[in-house]
Amino acid sequence: MTHTAAVYTDRTDSADAGRHLGEQVREALGADAPDALIVFASSRFDHAVLLAAIADTCHPRIMVGSSSAGEFTGQRRGEGTASALAFRSTAIQVSAGIGRGVTADSARAARDVVASFKGLETREFPHRSALIMTDALAGHADSLVEELTVLTSGKYQFAGGGAGDDARFAQTYVFYGTEAVSDAVVALELLSKEPLGIGVGHG
């Protein structure tokens, strides 16, 4: 069984916004920590402070995400805000990885990401997916996807996108735990015995 929660905050203080997101996750999922939390946050926040407050409040086992340009859930949307998707599941096994130095060596960054994948070591989970978030301003997004596909022998379906910064085009970040990192790519690996669908929609 899989339980999910999509949460949103328009609070402007980084620590307060992080606590607000974490509190909403706890209200939705109960006392047990989420297996994974995916965070999208405006560049107006101090991301390290925001992420630390989220972690201290709802204690996700894995947290990834990126800076963004407009944040939303199914009920709310805005700019200069933050949102997150949390889930806990008995049907999906998750892990996370990061590749740094995308600009200098995107192939190495891809190898570092794939080194964290558990699905290449087991046949227990026939369906393998990964959410990929990359620093858009570091470039090489297309080559990263190609390299990830080759390194996984085409056995994974990938979804994701590039980090934003409220359309300033100055500096973008991906999130790995409580770190906000530029010039990097992060992945959330999702392993399951049943297929996962990927839906496409924007705006």
How would you name each of these model-derived features?
Residues 1-203:
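Cofactor- and metal-binding active-site motifs of prokaryotic enzymes
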